[in-house]
Amino acid sequence: MICAVYKSRRKVDSYLFVEKRNVFERVPDALMKMFGEPDLVMMLPLMKRDHLGFADINKVKSELAEKGYYLQLPPPKVNLLEQHKLEIGYSRD
């Protein structure tokens, strides 16, 4: 299985995996509007891979088969100040 990977012009670090290059029929219209004009990043062969950088390869494969697309969103940003406060036990109360 080879899929096409597109990055979003609107959402930083958001990627859309689709079954075929320039085929977005199975992607919901609302998602395409939110994603914006897709920029092709690469054609990615999935059959010989056992992992991807930030996505679960098995989830990517299953969602491509079931839905025709997989949306990879960036991990949530960590508030380092709040994390540090928790680590040192700081509380306003």
Curated annotation (Swiss-Prot):
Domain spans labelled YcgL: 1-85
The protein's name in its UniProt record: YcgL domain-containing protein Ssed_2518
InterPro entries per record: YcgL-like_sf, YcgL_dom
Superkingdom as given in the UniProt entry: Bacteria
Disulfide bonds: none
Organism for this UniProt entry: Shewanella sediminis (strain HAW-EB3)
